[in-house]
Design a protein with these regions (language model features):
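Short, glycine/charged-enriched secondary-structure capping and boundary segments
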Residues: 51-54, 77-80, 112-113, 135, ...
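Ligand-binding beta-strand-loop-alpha-helix segment within the catalytic cores
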Residues: 59-126
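Glycine-rich nucleotide phosphate-binding loop and flanking beta-alpha elements
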Residues: 44, 106, 132-135
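Glycine-rich phosphate-binding loop
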Residues: 120-145
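Class I SAM-dependent methyltransferase SAM-binding "motif I" and its flanking Rossmann-like core
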Residues: 136-170
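N-terminal glycine-/serine-/threonine-rich phosphate-binding loop
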Residues: 1-36, 107
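Glycine-rich N-terminal segment of FAD-binding domains in flavoprotein oxidoreductases
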Residues: 25-54
Length: 170
């Protein structure tokens, strides 16, 4: 593991974006395509902003959305689909973006996501760690031995407090 220390969020975001771009370009050079998983949250603001400036052939990329609130419409300020569309997807021309759809039959959507995610190797995962050490809403104590690619989780109180504190919910 490599640890990079940065003085500002902007510097850290630029470092992360450059590394992500390098890995995506390597995957495209090797196999003609790249697959990445994107998360959201305040920790991703600067990374996604800087990633838009990187020279990546996005038309050879398929991206997957990591998580979403159940039954939250895409128009809601806290929607991760809205977050990714506004900050990333609407600015690059990906081959495909696979959203976590949480409206409708959630179990069917989870099965589809799992199938799609497992079709080929994921080249890059862009994730953050929350204030309570959650990774993609897998709050402690999460079952990290699950074989499911996507699961429904119950957020712990610290995670809920973080979401409100960051301004996603009023």
């Amino acid at each position: 593991m490599k640890i990079h220390v940065a003085k500002t969020a902007e510097e850290l975001g630029a470092q992360a974006a450059h590394t992500i771009a390098e890995k995506l370009c390597e995957a495209i050079a090797e196999s003609g395509e790249a697959r990445l998983v994107l998360s959201t949250g305040g920790s991703q603001f600067e990374t996604l902003k800087a990633l838009l400036q990187e020279d990546v052939p996005w038309d050879k990329g398929t991206a997957f959305h990591l998580d979403e609130y159940i039954d939250l419409p895409i128009t809601h300020a806290a929607s991760f689909r809205k977050y990714l569309k506004e900050r990333f997807i609407d600015h690059v021309h990906l081959k495909e973006f696979v959203f976590v759809e949480t409206e409708g039959d959630v179990d069917d959507n989870i099965r589809m996501l799992t199938r799609r995610l497992r079709e080929k190797t994921i080249d890059v995962g862009v994730i953050g760690i929350g204030e309570n050490a959650h990774i993609a809403f897998n709050d402690p104590p999460a079952d990290f031995d699950t074989k499911q690619a996507y699961i429904i989780v119950n957020l712990d109180s610290r995670c809920k407090k973080q979401q409100v504190g960051e301004g996603w919910f009023k």
